[in-house]
């Protein structure tokens, strides 16, 4: 069994901060469970375009609100606490937080924590062997 708190993540290489967001990667590929799990805060007033060509992502809002636009269809959705969106078709999308937007995210395949968004807003498909987490 793995037990972790956000305090365990803060200030480590699993605590990723950019101009638009902060993502604390709580479960990663090295944990060997087939998915990764993150708590991410996207900052109010920012705009972030992403395209997970190599991953499926589920995003569940627990605080704040944002508009999410499917860049392929032009559809825009208001995401509020208790609402999720699932990028099951690898959709290019843009997130525009109206307030600080706190979400819980699940990625499959799992990310390693070393990924950075490329020029298309995508993560490369990296692999990492599971390590002993005892």
From Swiss-Prot:
Q: Which UniProt keywords apply?
A: Lyase
Which top-level group of life is the source organism from?
Answer: Bacteria
Q: Does the keyword Lyase apply?
A: yes
Q: What is its EC number?
A: 4.2.1.108
> Would I find Transcription regulation among this entry's keywords?
no
Catalytic reaction list: (2S)-4-acetamido-2-aminobutanoate = L-ectoine + H2O
Q: Tell me, what is one Gene Ontology molecular-function annotation carried by this entry?
A: ectoine synthase activity
Q: Please give the CDD domains that the UniProt record associates with this protein.
A: cupin_EctC (cd06978)
Cite the Pfam families for this sequence.
Answer: Ectoine_synth
Pathway listed: Amine and polyamine biosynthesis; ectoine biosynthesis; L-ectoine from L-aspartate 4-semialdehyde: step 3/3
Question: SUPFAM superfamilies of this UniProt entry?
Answer: RmlC-like cupins
Its GO biological process annotations read:
ectoine biosynthetic process
Cystine bridges: none
Top-tier EC class: lyase
Q: Which family does it belong to?
A: Belongs to the ectoine synthase family.
Q: What does this protein do?
A: Catalyzes the circularization of gamma-N-acetyl-alpha,gamma-diaminobutyric acid (ADABA) to ectoine (1,4,5,6-tetrahydro-2-methyl-4-pyrimidine carboxylic acid), which is an excellent osmoprotectant.
Q: What is this protein called?
A: L-ectoine synthase
State the encoding gene. Answer: ectC
